[in-house]
Swiss-Prot record:
Recorded catalytic activity of this chain's protein: tRNA(Ala) + L-alanine + ATP = L-alanyl-tRNA(Ala) + AMP + diphosphate
Domain of life of the native organism: Bacteria
Compartments where located: Cytoplasm
The protein's name: Alanine--tRNA ligase
Amino acid sequence: MSIATPASSDLLRRTFLEFFAQRGHEIVPSAPLVPQNDPTLMFVNAGMVQFKDVFTGKDRRPYQRAASSQKCIRISGKHNDLENVGVTARHQTFFEMLGNFSFGDYFKEDAIAFAWELLTKVYDISPSRLVVTIYNGEGGFPADDEAAAIWRKVTGFGDDRILRLGLADNFWTMGDVGPCGPCSEIHFFHGKEPDVARFGEEPRIDGTGWTEIWNNVFMQYERAEKDGPLVPLPAPSIDTGMGLERLASVLQGVTSNYDTDLLRGLVDKAAELSGKPYSGGSADDDVSMRVIADHARTAAFLIAEGVMPEKQRREYVLRRVMRRAIRHGHRLGIDRPFLHEVALEVVRRMGETYPELRDRRELIARVTEDEEVRFRSTLKRGMKILDERFDEMRSSGERTLPAAAAADLYTTYGFPLDLTQVISAESNFDVDVQGAEAIIKGAGEADGPIDPTAAVDPAHREARAKLAQPVVFTGYEHEEGDSEIVAIVRVEIQGEGDRARKVRALVERAEAGAAVEIVVRETPFYAESGGQVGDVGEVTADGARVEVKDTQKPLAGLVVHEGVVHEGALAVGQRVHLAVDHAARSATRRNHSATHVLHWALRKVLGEHAQQKGSRVGPDVLRFDFTHNRPLTREEISRIEDLVNEKVLTNAKVTTEILAMDEARRRGAMAIFEEKYGDTVRMLTMTPEVVELCGGTHACALGDIGLFKITSEGGVAAGVRRILASTGLNALAYARGVEAELARARQVAKAQGGDLAEKIGKIVAHERELEKKVAELERRILEGAGPAQGGGGGGIDAMLDGARDIGGIKVLARRVPDGTNPGALRDLAEKLRDKLGDRSAVLLGAAVGDKAQLAVMLSKSATERLKAGELIKPIARIVGGSGGGRPDMAQAGGTDVAQLDAAIAALYTEVERALAS
């Protein structure tokens, strides 16, 4: 059977998945773009990412064959082709990867046969337009002659169509350690006459030439340590990936991914908004339209997952992509916010396949429009500054924009460094990118590297190997139970402070005083997962007692009870009694159930965009993070509390069911993007409106929660808010604490009944009036004090004595009477700057208690050559502090008052240095 061409991308995707489903593969939904429990990645960039733990043995699935269509983003790390997006026919930041996977089931022969059958029989691609590549055997790895032989048998190709390439092209590794193996790529020729002699050439801008469409990775080795020997895997695995956009270009008869039905509609939307035609060539306008199409797609998908454009980590990557698209719209002459319209076109075209787009339609539109409105003013300001700087550089003959200038555009105005590069290049200037990045990093603005996850401890692997099956959890029904010790892991702390680390080793016996991790066959203890903390309690047997302080799951199927042997001794094979701390478990159950009702209430009050981004529930804590781009009002908090407590008062029964994932979704269960789910899930039903997937322990009925009270609300990250709340007796204790605090406030304010707020208002108003009077007195004293530290007359004019001319700028640095508050310091510096006139810079300093305070003021004309925020940073370090501010005004503070005079005098040196650079 073959499909008719040109085929829609939806049909190609569906055909791929159906092909592998018919061959025994489990069809697995796309994982979220934000990696689940994998801090080594910024975004999911391949289909295998969600199976990484399966390949490494950390996780087990109920299937050995899988296939998926995975949404991917490649925009950071080694897969960063941002500058090529829109320029070439192949590069995008967002794409879909079709893949089939084998976890120790079939290997090379079946993988190659599947790929060839699908491409040539089902998709009906002519073999004459295909070549394959295999690994040639370099770098200490053997050549993949096995794959070559299979390809010859399956395709009938000679060696001229089975090309041998090296380590960089045809050998895949997960990292310095872990599974690895050769890979085999299938390439397609876009153009009239396939020419194998041109294979090594890059495809042309229009897409003609050879291009990879499918990669088959044969994981057959494992490296246990960096630079160590390769060891054959006992169960070799398969990981393949084929870009849907590339496949669509082949089967829709076009040479550019941007002319496929996945992207052409978005390109046309950009053309429509610009009022210019799209010709599909390499002209600047065509490139800009393609950039907008790709970047709008990336933005829509990330926002749908709760990523908001901000300054840190993933949020900054999103902001960078959005602002790059906006910049290209500006270049096309679009003079109004437009990106949200292209993003909504993404929703319209892809919302059926990816319902999260449709569900977050309003959020996507609002966030993209808000970001564009903000950035348009930044763009206008940044362009003006750059144009002025370019004029100066042309006059002086400079060709490279200094690092400080590029960094200042980012730190002061939020103008992206890569955008500065693009605009500079358009005007034939270079940018000192390395220097600018160093300055930005020093200012704390750069996103630091993401630390990789720790490897599984060998002792845990050994402990897991002793189990015939995964540890059975009995805690849904029981809080106590008996079991047999299968393994004891002794834990010792080696090193101190930051160098301290846990060293684990399996032992047969543990005596009193030993720190241990106990493994049994079945346990009522809940191991930490899904935001719920691990249970605490006791393990006892024959005079032995272990206080369990935590329960963890370091490896799939393995549960360890962490604690200390307080009495007696325990041995492997011994029967023990396990008892969960009832009070702690009950409080945790109340808090956990409350988080689910809270999630529902947040969506009800704030909108469907208020999605869970994280949670932490234990006996004393209920912490819930959710997507929302502003603080909650007092009225919203009250409404959320009311909704939760109204549900609690119904005392509705909490029920759980084990269902297939598809059935749970059909019945309306809410799944959380950050959570991992298997094929069978535990569905929690509290009310018809509150139905979610959860593996934790819960109250039997909502009435068990008792009372729900929000204790705080605030921001924790870009576009993410956090609620802390209490339930049951903890909520009652919180309410009593608030009552006691109010009683103390009434006593201090001498208030009666309900007039506390009025009394406090009068006290605050009186304090402000006194502050104004004090500030006025300080101003008069300062203006009459003259240049001496203790006063002495002369007034403000006398303080101008000693101003120096440095490079045409009048520079004045003074210490004023100690005790001068920062506001008065700033006001006086402003007056002195105005007295000095045009092209002036003033720094004043004073000791206020045990702190040194500094203020810098620059005239407008002086900011063309100097920046107050940059001048004050090295000066602040002299007094052991830090500071910053605008180009014309900056303040700083420090703790080393003894160095205040030296810091003030340093202004002259810093001005000279800045002007020289």
